[in-house]
């Protein structure tokens, strides 16, 4: 739906009480589909939080490129700040915030690399200029100037003028397998609705708790 207000009842609830959901991924799929229809740009944008070697939190926006019952997938450079932090401490938190719908979803869990086959398949779908950029960028490293970056891009582009661009060996993806997923929906006077799903093991069923706002 394109108008979040059209989804509200006088009670402030969205059409259908989402707190009755018994499984988080089906609920996420519903909310994400509505975000795709409602958000003006990047409904798949999510904040990714990691920690460095000193335990100092780090957060940045990334794009979710896939999700299913096993978790949420994103891609980047393995040697980037986030890549190094995840290699040292493979745990992360995600936050989806859909302002047009007045909703957010929080995710916490363990992180593991995707397979080479998954990374290759996704990389092949990227525009060629983005593929070239992945080769030219030394993400998170100091850059002398924009011109130096443009020179690197031109050099890679000349090398791959014809044919397909292979995936760089230092570029891949990660999957966040959730142990916690929380759904939050705004209601008047800050009397919001929150439910949290938890499980310690992907083989176990989810437990659900309603939380005070």
Curated annotation (Swiss-Prot):
Signal sequence interval, chain numbering: none
Catalytic activity: pyridoxamine 5'-phosphate + O2 + H2O = pyridoxal 5'-phosphate + H2O2 + NH4(+); pyridoxine 5'-phosphate + O2 = pyridoxal 5'-phosphate + H2O2
Entry GO MF terms: FMN binding; pyridoxamine phosphate oxidase activity
Keyword annotations of the record: Flavoprotein, FMN, Oxidoreductase, Pyridoxine biosynthesis
Pfam families assigned: PNP_phzG_C (PF10590), PNPOx_N (PF01243)
Superkingdom classification of source: Bacteria
Transmembrane segments: none
Family: Belongs to the pyridoxamine 5'-phosphate oxidase family.
Protein name: Pyridoxine/pyridoxamine 5'-phosphate oxidase
């Amino acid at each position: 739906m394109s108008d979040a207000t059209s989804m509200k009842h006088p009670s402030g609830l969205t059409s259908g009480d989402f707190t009755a959901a018994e499984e988080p991924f089906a609920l996420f799929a519903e909310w994400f589909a509505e975000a795709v229809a409602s958000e003006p740009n990047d409904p798949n944008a999510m904040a990714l939080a990691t920690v460095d070697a000193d335990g100092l939190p780090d957060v940045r926006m990334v794009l979710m490129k896939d999700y299913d019952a096993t978790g949420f997938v994103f891609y980047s450079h393995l040697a980037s700040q986030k890549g190094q932090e995840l290699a040292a401490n493979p745990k992360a938190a995600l936050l989806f915030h859909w302002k047009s719908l007045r909703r957010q979803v929080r995710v916490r869990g363990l992180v593991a690399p995707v397979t080479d086959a998954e990374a290759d398949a996704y990389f092949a779908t990227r525009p060629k200029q983005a593929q070239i950029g992945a080769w030219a960028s030394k993400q998170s490293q100091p850059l002398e100037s924009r011109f130096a970056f443009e020179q690197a891009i031109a050099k890679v582009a000349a090398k791959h003028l014809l044919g397909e661009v292979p995936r760089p060996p230092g570029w891949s993806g990660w999957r966040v397998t959730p142990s916690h997923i929380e759904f939050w929906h705004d209601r008047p006077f800050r009397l919001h609705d929150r439910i949290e799903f938890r499980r310690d093991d992907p083989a176990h069923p989810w437990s659900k708790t309603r939380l005070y706002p």
